[in-house]
Design a protein with these regions (language model features):
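Periplasmic c-type cytochrome electron-transfer domains
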Residues: 1-195
Length: 195
């Protein structure tokens, strides 16, 4: 079972529900965390982009995230595709031994729709990945959730996100749920410290 390998409280909750042992699942998540889960898959519609085992669809989206102070807006995927296509060592060049495996780059669009778009990140172990945003513009989950709740206009391109319009207590519940996605590393402690 893949969920037991990930070992987050959310995964244990899902495992318990899937085993039809409701008594076992009742204390795994708090009431607030369960309400946050309901918001995540319901009203907040987070699963549009954050789905699957990693809670990321690996697609590119412009969510209107502002650039870091003093920085120009980042062109995101649009710029990335252009840079890779111009690289003499990309997978489509004469040095590649398998450019047939490079169909994604061959057919990748670099149109204006990709301006300001970035790959959807996984929501696993969020506490370990702060600060948030493609350039670390947001210091806390609270800032991230407030951004999506308001969904401001993008500085460049278009913001695909729609305002969540959640109440403050719903944002708190959603954040509580997101924290259940953290899991301790499945590795011996000796490998986590300097020799």
């Amino acid at each position: 079972n893949r969920s037991s390998d990930l070992a987050s409280r959310f995964d244990e909750y899902v495992k318990s529900i899937n085993s039809n042992q409701k008594d076992d699942s009742s204390n795994i998540l708090t009431i607030q965390e369960k309400q946050g889960l309901k918001l995540f898959i319901g009203k907040a519609n987070c699963t549009n982009c954050h789905n699957g085992p990693l809670l990321a669809n690996n697609a590119f989206h412009n969510t209107g995230l502002l650039s870091s102070p003093g920085k120009l807006p980042d062109l995101g995927r649009k710029r990335g595709i252009d840079v890779v296509r111009q690289d003499p060592f990309n997978c489509l060049n004469a040095f590649s031994d398998n450019n047939k495996a490079c169909m994604e780059l061959l057919y990748a669009s670099s149109t204006k729709e990709l301006v300001g778009s970035f790959r959807t990140p996984s929501l696993r172990n969020l506490k370990l990945t702060a600060p948030y945003g493609h350039a670390g513009q947001q210091q806390s989950l609270t800032e991230v959730l407030n951004h999506y709740n308001e969904a401001p206009d993008a500085m460049i391109g278009h913001n695909e996100a729609k305002p969540l319009e959640l109440w403050s207590w719903e944002l708190w519940q959603l954040e509580a749920f997101l924290e259940t996605l953290d899991a301790p590393p499945k590795i011996e402690g000796k490998w986590l410290s300097a020799p």
